[in-house]
Amino acid sequence: MDYISTRGEAPSLGFCDALLTGLARDGGLYVPRKWPSFSKKEIRSLRGKTYQEIAFSILLPFTNGEIPDDTFRAMIDEAYGTFRHPAIAPLVQTGPNSFVMELFHGTTLAFKDVAMQLLARLMDYALEKRGERATIVGATSGDTGGAAIDAFAGRERTDIFILFPHGKVSPVQQRQMTTSTSANVHALAVEGNFDDCQNLVKAMFNDVAFRDKVRLSGVNSINWARIMAQIVYYFTTAVALGGPDRKISFTVPTGNFGDIFAGYCAKRMGLPIDRLVIATNENDILTRTLKTGRYDMKAVKATTSPSMDIQISSNFERLLFEAYDRDASKVRAAMESLKQSGGFEIAPEALKAIRRDFRAGRASEKQVAETIRKTHTETGYLLDPHSAIGVFVAAKKEKPNTPMVTLSTAHPAKFPVAVKSASGIDPALPTWLAGLMDREERFQIIKPELKAVETFIGQHARGETNAGAER
């Protein structure tokens, strides 16, 4: 198993190299050269196993034998030992065929913990083995930053720099990034939106001299290992609901397309998924793209679901690569058009392939608030705004007799203002985070300029020691 770039002009890499590299040197994203395959019999054999045991079985083929089995098992056990629910990703039934998969039982109350806790341990292992250090950079629309900082805080071989849009994340999300006391953690409040933050991260990776000098590595879902870790909960959920002997549908609130692309990966690996439904807020570029066949950027609107206030969905490039039968030249042309003119057309055959696997829908701000209120009134279940988008769209895409699972991506207490406004309920933070809002903050406000960000990182990163070979 090795990994190839969606743009076809970077070298193929083994697992640990792809892990530490993040973004390919041609600007593309790494994907497995070949999808592992699981038979129905193998999927049935997962029944009755713990989340950790299933994770080991599903993820092992991706590691290419580069990590000893016992070491990999221990990493998985340690990563998910940080979760507050024994099932890691438990299911809650909200209707006859409707389920919510709760992905917020990790340390920062968001689905990003599922991948980030494992990613930190994988990176530690790879860096330790090589005697290297790394400078971790990440852009966040809210949840990635807190999850990454929690996972990497205090780790000796990494410095972490998280860029978030100043004034555009929830107060809880901001405190989870700005109250760490670890010396290796740096939170940068960028005077712009999430797309500005993401563009700065990509620009740093494309600045080869800077990238090599500070030993740059990434934790956004441009990093294949993030997607890989998220594949697991599609398998655990499907098996719990009778898979592979019945098909399951999933609705995923998404902006950057990473979480739902993990579902696509699971389907490619043999999991019998019926529908993968993209749920967007008013920043609906993914819904528009499926409808029109044209990917066109618009201005970002601020909503009550800030983690989805995105117009450039990085992981859509991975799906394009698959839809174009892995023709990297067509992906390069699309990405160049996006860069030059803010959009691109998807060829009819590729669009047909995408529509075969995906459906899409959007929820307005009014519909989000109404879904939070209605769900709580009818079932007693409290949703955060992102999960409410999923529930609203799922209700319109359900099929009789096919279970529909909505991924709940964050705890409602991360968005108390929106939740209280919609439901009248003031969601409390769990006891272990009760003092979060009283902690002292530490962050740097910075302009959305590459030079300013690189200068700050260059002054604070320790990654250029023990430089080693280029990645």
Predicted features and spans:
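PLP-dependent amino-acid enzyme catalytic core
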Residues: 1-471
